[in-house]
C-alpha cells in the first residue's frame, strides 16, 4: 500500500499463499475462493476471459469481487510470487475510505455477481460452503457494518432487505463452518439480532458505539 505516486514500498499486504501454487485441484480451489486476495494483483492468460466470456460488471465499484471466483476457476495452474510487484495507491476518495449507501449497494451487486457466476459456470454445489461464506461476508457482513459506521440516517428497510436477501440465498449461512470459525463473537451476536429484529439491532448498535465513544473520549478506553 502507498499514499503517493512512487515505487516506495509502504505497508506490505500479502495476497495469496504459497501453498495455493501448482495444478489447481479441489483443495487449492477452495483455498482460492476463501483467500484469493485481490484480483488486480494477478496476471491472467487472455484466453481465460476470451474463451469463457467473463466480463467485469459495469458501473459499479468492487467489480473485481463479482468475477474473481469465475476467473480463477477457469484456470488450471496458479503460482504465487512472494515479491512486491503491485503498488496500491490509497487516497481519500478510494473505495477503502468512502462509505455511502451507494457504495454499499455496489458491494451487494458484486455479491450477487459471485452467486450468479457460481450458478452460471456450475461450481456452486461443488464449493457451496466456500461460496456461501464469501457471499455472506461481501454481500452482508462487510456491507452491514460498513453501512452502520457511515454517517447519516440508517434505513431500516435497506438493512432488512439485505438480511432477507442473504437468508433467501443461504438460509443456513450461520451454520457454515467458515462463518463459525472466522466471524468474531460480537459480530455473530449482532448479526443474529438483526436477523430477528432490524430495529433492535440498530438501537443496540448505536447505543453500544455511543457508550464506547464516550468512554474513549473521557477515560481513554476503547
Describe every region a protein language model picked out.
Residues 1-79, 89-99:
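Donor-binding/catalytic cores of nucleotide-activated saccharide
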Residues 39, 75, 80-81, 93-97, ...:
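Gram-positive cell-envelope targeting signals
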Residues 149-222:
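Membrane-interface aromatic/basic loop that binds lipid-linked glycans or pyrophosphate carriers
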Residues 68, 111-114, 139-140:
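Hydrophobic alpha-helical core bundles mediating ligand binding, dimerization, or RNAP-core interactions
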Residues 132-146:
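Amphipathic alpha-helical repeat scaffolds of TPR domains
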Residues 59-60, 68, 77-110, 124, ...:
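Nucleotide-sugar-dependent glycosyltransferase catalytic core
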Residues 109-130, 168-182, 188:
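C-terminal, non-catalytic tails of nucleotide-sugar-dependent glycosyltransferases
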Residues 127-134, 156-160:
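Short, charged, amphipathic alpha-helical segments
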